[in-house]
Swiss-Prot record:
Source organism phylogeny: Eukaryota, Metazoa, Chordata, Craniata, Vertebrata
Region described as Disordered: 59-81, 111-139, 179-251
InterPro entries given in the database record: GBX-1/2, HD, HD_metazoa, Homeobox_CS, Homeodomain-like_sf
Entries under CDD domains matching the protein: homeodomain
Keywords: DNA-binding, Homeobox, Nucleus, Transcription, Transcription regulation
GO molecular function: DNA-binding transcription activator activity, RNA polymerase II-specific; RNA polymerase II core promoter sequence-specific DNA binding; RNA polymerase II transcription regulatory region sequence-specific DNA binding; RNA polymerase II-specific DNA-binding transcription factor binding
Highest taxon above the source species: Eukaryota
Protein name: Homeobox protein GBX-2
Record has Nucleus as a keyword: yes
Principal location: nucleus
Role description: May act as a transcription factor for cell pluripotency and differentiation in the embryo.
One GO BP annotation of this record: tube morphogenesis
Originating species: Mus musculus (Mouse)
Protein's cellular compartments: Nucleus
DNA-binding annotation, residue ranges on this chain: 247-306
Length: 348
């Protein structure tokens, strides 16, 4: 009968080599009393839900039924080969193994290693009743118990890993939420700056765009010598639209007093500082932007007059400015002399 279970015997004999670090007799002889301070075991509450599922070993009736069927065939010389002795011996060994498991778990925090489990299996084997001559049943029961303990340890490891992964996931989600909040705050801080910059750009474009400059300068070109008489005509150009249909900004209607003061300031100084511009605007009851644009247009007109209209002093029309061409070297002196004579005759 015992030859029918060689794998179970080999499985029970294999792990004993790894449990040489502990003394089985010392563990069994005096089980350590767990002090209340040491009864802190992080994996134990997680281990509780798996206990009723894992602790009952796989049902032993399939191997026990053929044994029960073969029991009457044994010689009657052994009266203690009765079937009721089997479950009692199995249950007693299982109860002792459970007690030893609980004490080892309470005292050893690293109870997931392999050596305490094999020590429990060896201790259960020592405490069990002596095997009968056909003792294949008890070997099978011990093998099943060892398998159940291995399953418990594996499930406990799995539970601890699940708990760690869940904690890491929660931590990662918290970190992501904090980072997302920081990004939102930075966006909120950046948005007002962008809005202010766009508003300032729009205001600058609105007040000093190129569409406004040619209208005022062209209007002033019509009467270059009568800057003070521009006021009556400037009001009539209000609200005019260009060919593209874009509404142009209304032109400022300066009074004669304002134009006189602006001309005086421009005669004194072509470029104003910020403080001077604010003082002039406050004195003339104008905005600083209006003063700035008036000075820009006045400087453009002044540069045009200085460049092109300087020929009006000689009596020549300003639309035909005199073009000075450099004389090449190979031109004869006679030609140059005749050219000078023509120029002198042209003058009055």
């Amino acid at each position: 009968m015992s030859a029918a279970f060689p794998p179970s015997l080999m499985m029970m004999q294999r792990p004993l080599g790894s449990s040489t670090a502990f003394s089985i007799d010392s563990l069994i002889g005096s089980p350590p009393q767990p002090s209340p301070g040491h009864f802190v075991y992080t994996g134990y509450p997680m281990f509780m839900p798996y206990r009723p599922v894992v602790l009952p070993p796989p049902p032993p009736p399939p191997p026990a039924l053929p044994q029960a069927a073969l029991q009457p065939a044994l010689p009657p010389a052994h009266p203690h080969h009765q079937i009721p002795s089997l479950p009692t011996g199995f249950c007693s060994s299982l109860a002792q193994g459970m007690a030893l498991t609980s004490t080892l778990m309470a005292t050893l925090p690293g109870g997931f290693s392999a050596s305490p489990q094999h020590q429990e299996a060896a201790a259960a084997r020592k405490f069990a009743p002596q095997p009968l001559p056909g003792g294949g049943n008890f070997d099978k029961a011990e093998a099943l118990q060892a398998d159940a303990e291995d399953g418990k340890a594996f499930l406990a490891k799995e539970g601890s890993l699940l708990a760690f992964s869940a904690a890491e996931a929660v931590q990662a989600s918290l970190v992501g939420a904090v980072r997302g909040q920081g990004k939102d705050e930075s966006k909120v801080e950046d948005d007002p700056k962008g809005k202010e910059e766009s508003f300032s750009l729009e205001s600058d474009v609105d007040y000093s765009s190129d569409d406004n400059l040619p209208g005022q300068t062209a209007h002033k070109e019509e009467d270059p010598g009568h800057a003070l008489e521009e006021t009556p005509q400037s009001g009539g150009a209000a609200g005019s639209t260009t060919s593209t249909g874009k509404n142009r900004r209304r032109r400022t209607a300066f009074t004669s007093e304002q134009l006189l003061e602006l001309e005086k300031e421009f005669h004194c100084k072509k470029y104003l500082s910020l403080t001077e511009r604010s003082q002039i605007a406050h004195a003339l009851k104008l905005s600083e932007v209006q003063v700035k644009i008036w000075f820009q247009n006045r400087r453009a007109k002044w540069k045009r007059v200085k460049a092109g209209n300087a020929n009006s002093k000689t009596g020549e029309p300003s639309r035909n400015p005199k073009i000075v061409v450099p004389i090449p070297v190979h031109v004869s002196r006679f030609a140059i002399r005749s050219q000078h004579q023509q120029l002198e005759q042209a003058r009055p």
